[in-house]
């Protein structure tokens, strides 16, 4: 039985499924009618997870040890971890935004392992004596699970910042068109003719045609209006007042869409990072114990150890600000976004570029061959 061909086939099938699912989630985020097929996409995530599980099992059978001894195996396990987190979070929260965030990182991680690494790095190899320990499964598995949780939580935070940025960038245009409004007298209400058909979705004050309006629509329109009028229930045909200093989405009942998405992302980020941090702590401690058994020292400030400690500090600061200071929203999201970069440096950057006990030496070997 050619285990390598089977593993390659399983990896390629998993990639194809994840690619199709990622496209589905992106389309679903823009066209709500396709949501009726969401259960099929969720089944696809489960199928990809099963295929990756089989890939790891075949690898385990071939090597006679847990398949986390090189970069390729760790990438496969990381992609499996992303799909597992996706399944768990969507089952718990039933939030459809999870697929939009997690499916790309699952796909790209698997693609890097399948298509970017040279074939010799994808083939199974025997363990060096220092790695022939039960600590391999304990330490490396927990560290990879912590990476997956921390990266996922940081991605939620990064998406929160993106939505906040575009919301704030859009605000000067949507909220009031200040240049158009400042000439109006703000101390009193003023009378204008308002018809719903005349509201331009891009600019509420543009293309205002009085000839198409009806006399009964005349009324006082204040610059600022009550929250009830901003809820989207106001109707000019009933003589209700529509707000001037608000966005078109608010006029038609979608004012809270961004707010709900941001709240959802903030909560998902907090809870996922709250899971990843203790896993990282346990992984670092187990690694220290294993290092003492293998090399006689708990801590040697190896580049991997140093960056793992930096990663731990970043997320410790994040949780401290959330729990102790009560921070929410942009500030902790910025910290988590920094953590996203630091985690990837700790996982890939150090392993590929540096020399140390945790180095894979791929880049160094390529450089030496040039």
Regions found by a protein language model. Give the residues of each.
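Hydrophobic cores of alpha-helical transmembrane segments in multi-pass integral membrane proteins
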Residues: 4-124, 138-165, 175-219, 244, ...
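Alpha-helical transmembrane segments and their interfaces in multipass membrane proteins
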Residues: 126-133
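Short amphipathic alpha-helical coupling elements at transmembrane boundaries
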Residues: 129, 260-267
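Membrane interface segments of multi-pass transport proteins and intramembrane proteases
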Residues: 132, 256, 328-329
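Acidic, metal/ion-handling microdomains and their immediate structural contexts
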Residues: 168
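Cytosolic, membrane-interface loops and tails of multi-pass inner-membrane proteins
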Residues: 174-176, 252-260
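Long, intrinsically disordered low-complexity tandem-repeat segments
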Residues: 221-235, 242-253
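Short, charged amphipathic alpha-helical segments flanked by flexible coils
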Residues: 296-298
